[in-house]
């Protein structure tokens, strides 16, 4: 880049206005990346945003991922719209897992019942994205079943505690073997 181009880039004003969409963890908004630089480019006070967001989410369990819209106004003030937790958070919580499957379709990371899916759908149907489009509950349920499938979570009609315990034991053995294989692969790569 020429000296003139660099000088011109240095003189540009920061972007003002617009909407920033992000998933921010409840009570854990911090001025660092990835949110800090995006807000800084728009001229928004990062510390003020973090303070306001953390204050508004203090009643929610810390660490829950919340879809957030930040409406930046031309005078560099902002308005925060906080949505409900993500579908993947609800599904992973219902299945009792931390991560989805590595290879969806080939492995099952967890199990949820149709009752779980229905309860999640009732909560998410109130979400702005579904409510504005007047989406029927059956469509929300299908959407959540699709999300579960993409996470490697199997939706079953009924699930007894014995079946769940057997699945969790089997899954723990599978994850331990997977971790062992990963460590062996890392050691092999380090030797090369």
From Swiss-Prot:
GO terms for molecular function: large ribosomal subunit rRNA binding; RNA binding; structural constituent of ribosome. The keyword Transit peptide applies. Component of the mitochondrial large ribosomal subunit (mt-LSU). Mature mammalian 55S mitochondrial ribosomes consist of a small (28S) and a large (39S) subunit. The 28S small subunit contains a 12S ribosomal RNA (12S mt-rRNA) and 30 different proteins. The 39S large subunit contains a 16S rRNA (16S mt-rRNA), a copy of mitochondrial valine transfer RNA (mt-tRNA(Val)), which plays an integral structural role, and 52 different proteins. This is Large ribosomal subunit protein uL11m. Coiled coil: none annotated. CDD domains: Ribosomal_L11 (cd00349). NCBIfam families: L11_bact (TIGR01632). The keyword Ribosomal protein applies. It comes from the Eukaryota. InterPro entries: Ribosomal_uL11, Ribosomal_uL11_bac-typ, Ribosomal_uL11_C, Ribosomal_uL11_C_sf, Ribosomal_uL11_N, Ribosomal_uL11_N_sf. GO terms for cellular component: mitochondrial inner membrane; mitochondrial large ribosomal subunit; mitochondrial ribosome; mitochondrion. The gene is MRPL11. Belongs to the universal ribosomal protein uL11 family. It is found in: Mitochondrion. GO terms for biological process: mitochondrial translation; translation. Keywords: Mitochondrion, Ribonucleoprotein, Ribosomal protein, Transit peptide.
């Amino acid at each position: 880049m020429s000296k003139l181009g660099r000088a011109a880039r240095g003189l540009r004003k920061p972007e003002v206005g617009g909407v920033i969409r992000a998933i921010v963890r409840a009570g854990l908004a911090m001025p660092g990346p990835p949110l800090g630089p995006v807000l800084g480019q728009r001229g928004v006070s990062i510390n003020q945003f973090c303070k306001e967001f953390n204050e508004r989410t203090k009643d929610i369990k810390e660490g829950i991922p919340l879809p957030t819209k930040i409406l930046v106004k031309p005078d560099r003030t902002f308005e925060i719209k906080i949505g409900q937790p993500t579908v993947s958070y609800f599904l992973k919580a219902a299945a009792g897992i931390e991560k989805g499957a590595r290879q969806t379709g080939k492995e099952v990371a967890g199990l949820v019942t149709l009752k779980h899916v229905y309860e999640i759908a009732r909560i998410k149907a109130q979400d702005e994205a579904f409510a504005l489009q007047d989406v029927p509950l059956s469509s929300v349920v299908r959407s959540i079943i699709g999300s579960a499938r993409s996470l490697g979570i199997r939706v079953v009609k009924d699930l007894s505690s014995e079946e769940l315990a057997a699945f969790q034991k089997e899954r723990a053995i599978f994850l331990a073997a997977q971790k062992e294989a990963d460590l062996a692969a890392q050691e092999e790569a380090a030797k090369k």
